């Protein structure tokens, strides 16, 4: 049985499976790209405002069973157990759980690994435990969505997403736009397997040390998103979309450069390869979140394949990996295995 959970903003329950009939759940959660912020000025009482999208690879897949005691195996297993402990403390999650992380989005690569793992584990454990909560609340309880709602919205429904930034509420930012990506578009991802982006306490300090963004810059970023990037995407105009994303990335990258050794790229080699892809015909180049993952958009699989074959050896020579992804227009998927199926 394949079950894709409902959108949280439809005010439906987060937990739908009958726990008495369910032996295990497997959750597959998509990575996301964070394409930039709208407002790091904050004069209007809201800060951040994020742009992003769900992609079909890499992804995190976890399988959770009821157990006599908590246990976890696979990458990021300690973080998975921390999610269970937090849900037990804050929601009274009953029982114990055995967690297998079959694959995981690379950690601290700018692809939203922490949010997807937390929501995947929480989805499975809460359904097995018979607890129903809206997805936004689950994000808050697991300390996700503190600045951006892109990861939660990507898990929820996929697509291209714009959120309205953080106000005074503790809840994740409201989602303003969530629309499908054109099915034919492809994204070339530039990965650096040996590097990590700014994260944890260092990330908190970096945000605190950044000066307020100029109001005119924040206004221009909002203008680019509302009047160019979003409508161009909806009209399948990849050139217009790409121009907007490249400019957004340049403006946001300039603002974050003091936290990245004076560069818009956390790994300059990634930026160099992204510019080569752009010269080869790709559009909308940039860095996802704090990186090091870079990206570039093309209109079709054929053009993605051509650029991949032209630059994959260049990437390898620089210690980088080049891969092709597509947008994902659905959220996480949940496979329910019943007691009858497993014999438990």
Question: Where are each of the predicted segments found?
Answer:
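Phosphate-handling active-site elements
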Residues: 93-96, 125-141, 167-173, 302-311
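Active-site rim beta-loop-alpha module in soluble metabolic enzymes
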Residues: 192, 197-265
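Short beta-strand segments
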Residues: 28, 54, 153-156, 189-193, ...
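DPxDG-like acidic metal-binding loop motif
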Residues: 111-135, 154-166
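Glycine-rich, charge-dense phosphate/pyrophosphate-binding loop(s)
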Residues: 233-344
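ATP-binding N-lobe of GHMP and related small-molecule kinases
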Residues: 2-109, 126-133, 146, 329-332, ...
């Amino acid at each position: 049985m394949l079950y894709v959970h409902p959108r949280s903003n439809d005010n439906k329950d987060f937990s739908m499976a009958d726990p008495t009939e369910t032996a295990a759940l497997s959750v597959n959660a998509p990575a996301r790209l964070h394409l930039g912020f709208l407002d790091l000025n904050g004069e209007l009482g809201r800060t951040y405002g994020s742009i992003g999208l769900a992609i079909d690879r890499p992804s995190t897949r976890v399988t959770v069973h009821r157990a006599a005691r908590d246990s976890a195996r696979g990458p990021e297993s300690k973080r998975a157990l921390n999610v269970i402990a937090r849900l037990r403390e804050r929601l009274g999650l009953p029982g114990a759980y055995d967690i297998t992380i079959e694959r995981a989005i690379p950690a601290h690569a700018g692809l939203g690994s922490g949010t997807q793992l937390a929501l995947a584990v929480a989805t499975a454990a809460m359904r097995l435990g018979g607890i129903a909560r809206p997805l936004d609340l689950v994000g808050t309880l697991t300390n996700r969505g503190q600045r951006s709602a892109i990861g939660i919205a990507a898990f929820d429904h996929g697509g291209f997403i714009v959120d309205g930034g953080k106000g005074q509420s503790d809840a994740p930012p409201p989602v303003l736009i969530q629309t499908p990506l054109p099915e034919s578009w492809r994204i070339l991802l530039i990965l650096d397997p040996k590097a990590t982006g700014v994260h944890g306490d260092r990330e908190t300090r970096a945000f605190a040390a950044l000066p307020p963004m100029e109001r005119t810059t924040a206004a221009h970023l909002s203008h680019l998103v509302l009047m160019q990037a979003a409508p161009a995407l909806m009209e399948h105009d990849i050139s217009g979309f790409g121009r907007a994303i490249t400019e957004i990335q340049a403006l946001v990258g300039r603002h974050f450069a003091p936290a990245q050794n004076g560069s818009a790229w956390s790994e300059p080699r990634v930026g160099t390869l992204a510019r080569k892809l752009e010269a080869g015909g790709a559009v909308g180049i940039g860095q996802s979140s704090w990186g090091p993952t870079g990206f570039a958009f093309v209109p079709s699989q054929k053009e993605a394949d051509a650029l991949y074959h032209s630059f994959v050896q260049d990437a390898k020579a620089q210690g980088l990996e080049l891969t092709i992804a597509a947008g994902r227009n659905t959220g996480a998927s949940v496979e329910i295995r019943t007691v009858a199926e497993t014999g438990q």
